[in-house]
Every structure is written in C-alpha cells, then in structure tokens.
Amino acid sequence: MNFMKFALFFSAILSFQVLCSQDYPTLRIIFTGDIMGHDSQIESALNTGTAGYDYTSCFRYLEPYLSSADITAGNLEVTLAGPPYKGYPAFSSPDELGTALHETGFDILLTANNHALDRGRAGVERTIEQLEQQGFIHTGTFKNAFTRALTYPLIVEKNGIRLAILNITYGTNGLSPEPPAIVNYLDTIQILEDLEKASGARPDFTVVTVHWGLSLIHISEPTRPY
C-alpha cells in the first residue's frame, strides 16, 4: 500500500508545566493541523483483498510522537458521512480513517472547519455519531443547540489539570448549516459568551483553536497576526 500524506499544517506541541517542581502536575498536549482525505489518499487506503479500507501505514511513523502526549488533538477536515467516499471539494472519508486515528493516539478531534458542511446536516450528524462510537472526544460542530449548551466549551481534565477548549472556523465555503445542526463560526459576541462560560468552569488553562488562513503556507497572513 502506498504511504499517504496527511497534511499536518501548523502543527504545534504545547507543554503545560504548572511549576518546575516535580511535586506539581504536568500535562503535555499535542495539537496537529489539518487531517485531510483527498481522492488519492482514499484510493491508497483501499484494501483490494477485502474491499475495505486500512489507513494504518500512513500513521506508523507518527504514532510514537502522537501517542507520547497526555492529550493529542487534531483538526478533522473531512466528514465521516459514509459513501460515496470522495475528496475535494466535498470530503467524506471511510470510517476506517477514524479507527486509524484512534489507534495512532488521537484523543480529541476538532470539527469546526471550512469542510464541516461538505455533506450537509446528515454529514455533520453522522460524523459526530461515528466519532462517539469510536471513542473520541470532539467539539466544534453539534447536532443541535441542546447538545452544544450541554457540552461546549469542551472541558477536559487530565493529570489534575483542567482545560477548556474552544473550536471555531472562519466559514464553511459559503454553506450554511441546516437547522438544528450547529457549526461554531468566528462570531466575536458568541466567542465572548463562550469564554465567559468557560471561565465559570474554572479551568487551569483555556485553549482557543481557530480554523482560518491559506493552505500550504507556513507564516501568518497579514490579516491574521494573532
């Protein structure tokens, strides 16, 4: 099977160390960038012997790093909307992609990005269902306002350290979510409300992940200096 190249743009490794003393807890987090699924990647994952898909080989060199953190999170920039499986411009990858991500060490998948609505409301809902069935923590898109109010901002506690995580996108390629589905957009008023709610959960750290910018560049755009 050909190795597949998943874009891990803007990857960052964050280490939170409360104090230098070993008497205090530490938390190591890895955030990766875009996990994509173009047509060539889907074709490379096809197991012709079983007619299923196997993404294991594409992550084998990353697994030692991604599994070494206390928490590993990534931007899932595809839907798991079921067949037909397609890449750009309306991404839907096989469920086996999620299986491989879980086995590689991903704990959290962030779903607010410009491809969140590639397969409409049904795609949002099925992606959420698959992530939950596969044991992921996830945030960024929601089936309805009730689940958003109940689960967002995402609160995660590990090693005695409490995190609040917000996930936002600049847009969804001109598509609007069909109610009751919700995508977190770059809305200043809503973000301030979410930050206030996060503060009420008394996190030790608040992490805000925003999906924006141009593909295939390694520096910030002039309009995105922060």
Where are these predicted regions, by residue range?
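Acidic, metal/ion-coordinating pockets
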Residues: 22-220, 224
